[in-house]
């Protein structure tokens, strides 16, 4: 007898795999949480940081991050010492030479360097360099003020980044060398600002030097006092307008200018006078009158009436007993009373510095126009 048929057991239902979120969804969720950090208040951020530091899995998280960094981090090439910036060195040397910046280390030459005037100017009280020193002092003050602001901003930003990296080193691995590398990177970025500041300062100093100290600059006029002193000496010594070195120093002291300026003024004045003598006759008359007034004021009262005029008088014809009086009288006659039919008298002293007009051959020996200037000068 056949065995009874057994019912077929039902097949088990297929297992459903658990639904997993796509990988992109997790990444976007993490990024969204990171972006939400900026919207948190300071209290919320401090609370989250405290919760993370107190979490029992913090050490495990730090170990995983160290392992990941060791596998994927790109090795950073650290330089022992960055090469110095050649442009910054040139700018520093220029600012130091012009007296704008101060040397970092002061040695034996500090005393000698402190006595020198900034910018290579001599230690004189001449008017020519007073404006230059005042402007240079303003540039120096602005430079040090801006440099101090730059250094303060660089220190504050560097300190902020260093503190931030130290805070992050509690969660992720950050080495000391990486902190130093980040600080050097920040300072190199700030050096561009320092370079621009020093470049602008050097340009300002060079512009100042070209305006005040360049030999090719526009000629500056002397003061009225200096001009009067020089002109008075020139016209009172018209026969020999070549002052000695002692006289130049005295004129420079009276006019408040330098000896070199006195020498240049006399050289230019002699050239201009020889080129256009007639133009300077009025000026010569004015300064000659000043010189004669000073001469009369210095003489005794008893002699002033006899020596104050070149015309014949009670003291005899042409009573001139002094060589300077002869020169003064002849110059006055030459400029104020030119003879008719003759020529004006011209000085012939000091290697004919001023060429005289030729004497007419027909002039008699007794004419006033044929007066022998050399004999009078001697």
From Swiss-Prot:
Q: Where is this region: Disordered?
A: 1-24, 100-125, 291-320, 355-378
Q: What is its main location?
A: nucleus
Is the keyword Cytoplasm assigned to this protein?
no
Coiled-coil zones: none
Q: What is this protein called?
A: Pre-B-cell leukemia transcription factor 4
A cellular component term, taken from the record's GO annotations: XY body
Q: Name the DNA-binding stretches.
A: 215-277
Region entry PBC-B, spans: 110-214
What Gene3D superfamilies is this protein classified in? Homeodomain-like
Which residue intervals make up region (PBC-A)?
29-107
InterPro entries, sorted: HD, Homeodomain-like_sf, KN_HD, PBX_PBC_dom, TALE_homeobox
Spans of biased composition, class Pro residues?
Answer: 1-15
